[in-house]
């Protein structure tokens, strides 16, 4: 692997002007392209401290064998050149917004004598008008099926058209009046083109004129007593209205805009785009991309900049549109945040469009509501992507094998346990322990712990807390193993389900009678060393321990001799890293939910909770009857027994708990004059 010091530019040789740079590998292939306001500042950051770089960036620098740059005069030129180089070289370390499929569009071949309507995928061609993209081809076919009743335009291929012209007989669509049958001369070329142009006007949003004209024709036919034609026109108007209902007005001002939203985590980001034309959503597209890991390249502003550059650059290359409704670059692009290069991007997009383009962050009204809808779609897309990846058996097997190879384990970690600590400024310190078996969560084995020794009185020590949880968990394992009839029980998820053990033996304790293959703690070297020291103290040597640091997704292994080892770096697209991240995030979620529950109970605790035999229902009845604890404290035994279900003994216990007998009430109760509702 090349040494970065061998190709680092000489001090002072890098210009300070804006420009675009590219790294090449030993074979001359471009592996990364970037731009910078100051080439010197940006390039020096790659060589200053390799250990401080994100894993993906560090891998890129270690893979490269040379770096070169081009100075430009403006940031707009840098933006354009960066896009061109990424498009030309397809560098492996750059973020690429690739569709997982080619989205279909509705194409109208206006360059033919008899234009036709068709589902199309591929590069744009001159003389063809495009509508879309659509998320599915069936959505286009459904639209055609509905609208060809109103606009009976040709949808057949050139071969079918020629064959029916030769036999002088229309196809089935011609017989059922869903095609005007120009192949047999039922309409002229000019009449057929007029039908097609009306169809295009309808999809372009010019619906009011078409419906108004049809209503006039329907009324005229009715006055002439041509009821059959009037009924047909009525049905056509109904079909057009149904088609319009499928495209609900989302922006009342008839705006043409693209609405962009992101959802991301540490490794990946999902982007969704709604194409709004004439105030109606005409199409939707989505991507899931791998983030670079470099802090400056994982911000929302950077993701927006990269997406706009690549997406609209690609759209412009596919071919511009002849009118406003199908122009690939709209007048307005609504984004979640404005990038640092907003002015340069607006200038570049305006050049692509041929007129002014503005970038905006929606603040209120319909645009804000639509942006939130697109955001929810992005979140759903990211969730579905992760669930699909996690649920795939092949991916899970590859993930377990990847972890085994990276950590040098003897076997694949079929059972993984992970610990996470949660607290707020040292209060309500809790821990969670989650279990994954065969790469899937086993929620029946989840546990939570209230930290006893390592926390209290507003103090918290995460390292000591990790040690405490590890000790308690594996003490339980050793105790259950000793209690098993045959010494150490069978290791595996079904060890607790053997029929001969009986209902008591197969209950909760036996689930921890076998250890995990891999024990994960949330944190770096201090946390993982604390867990490893506990296992060493207990004499457990068959459990691998690692720590997963959140900042750079580094995997730490224990080193009890006091030296700081280098972390294990997984490739960012590794199934193994994805599984470890999912385990860690699940532990974090479970810990937070328990912490919030415990904190909520503490904040709503009442002196009545300590009264023996007084349940929640009767506590609510007392509070509802008297209105506050202060008034309840001032009541007599007879007044309290007037509440249904409260006897004299319970009433005296209530007054004793509130300090009424001694005349000294607890400080958090005696001054409580607030109203309390049940």
UniProtKB/Swiss-Prot annotation:
Cellular compartment(s): Cytoplasm
SMART domains: GIYc, HhH1
Region (Disordered): 477-508
Ranges of residues in domain GIY-YIG: 16-95
GO cellular component, one term: excinuclease repair complex
CDD domains membership: GIY-YIG_UvrC_Cho
Positions of the UVR domain: 208-243
Family membership: Belongs to the UvrC family.
General function of this protein: The UvrABC repair system catalyzes the recognition and processing of DNA lesions. UvrC both incises the 5' and 3' sides of the lesion. The N-terminal half is responsible for the 3' incision and the C-terminal half is responsible for the 5' incision.
Protein name: UvrABC system protein C
Species, as recorded: Mycolicibacterium vanbaalenii (strain DSM 7251 / JCM 13017 / BCRC 16820 / KCTC 9966 / NRRL B-24157 / PYR-1) (Mycobacterium vanbaalenii)
Gene that this sequence comes from: uvrC
